[in-house]
C-alpha cells in the first residue's frame, strides 16, 4: 500500500511491495508503472495468499529473484558465482546471495566484493540474533571465505 500511496501522491517511497506482490509481478504482470497494474498486483497477491502457503510463495520468489549479472533465482546465481550446485551451499554463501537481493547493483560480489561481504556479515548476525544459526555457525561463517569463483579466475 505504501508504494501505491507514493504513486498517487507523486512521491516515490521506494520498496517493491510484499514478496507476494513481487511474485505476482515476476510471474504474471508486466513491470509497467500504472495504477491499473498496481491494483491488479494487489488483488492477485491477495488471491495468491489464499491459494498458496508462505513457503510455496517464497519458493516461487527465490526461483525468480534477480541476483545480479543476469542471474534469476538462487540456483542459477549460486552456479554462476560459486560454480557449484545450490544443494552444496554453505551458510556463508547463502547469506552472501541473500544480501544481493536488496540492491543487486550495489552489493554485486563480482564488482563490489567488500560491500558484498559487509552485507553478508550483517545477514549472518541477524540470523544469529534471531536464533536461526548457533554461535559456532556464526563464527565459522564470518571467517568463511565466500569469494565467488568469478573473482578467483
Predicted regions mapped to residue ranges:
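Conserved catalytic or metal-liganding residues and their short signature motifs at active sites
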Residues: 1-3, 7
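Non-catalytic, structured segments within soluble enzyme domains
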Residues: 10-142, 146
Amino acid at each position: 500500500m505504501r508504494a501505491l500511496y507514493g504513486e498517487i501522491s507523486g512521491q516515490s517511497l521506494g520498496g517493491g511491495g510484499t514478496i507476494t506482490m513481487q511474485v505476482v509481478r515476476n510471474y504474471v504482470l508486466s513491470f509497467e508503472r500504472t495504477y491499473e497494474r498496481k491494483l491488479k498486483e494487489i488483488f492477485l497477491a491477495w488471491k495468491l495468499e489464499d491459494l498458496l502457503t508462505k513457503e510455496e510463495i517464497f519458493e516461487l520468489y527465490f526461483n525468480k529473484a534477480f541476483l545480479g549479472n543476469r542471474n534469476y533465482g538462487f540456483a542459477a546465481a549460486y552456479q554462476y558465482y560459486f560454480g557449484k550446485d545450490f544443494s552444496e551451499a554453505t551458510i556463508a554463501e547463502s547469506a552472501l546471495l541473500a544480501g544481493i537481493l536488496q540492491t543487486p547493483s550495489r552489493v554485486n560480489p563480482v564488482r563490489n566484493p567488500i560491500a558484498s561481504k559487509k552485507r553478508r556479515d550483517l545477514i549472518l548476525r541477524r540470523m544469529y540474533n534471531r536464533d536461526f544459526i548457533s554461535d559456532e555457525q556464526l563464527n565459522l561463517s564470518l571467517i568463511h571465505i565466500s569469494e565467488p569463483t568469478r573473482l578467483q579466475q
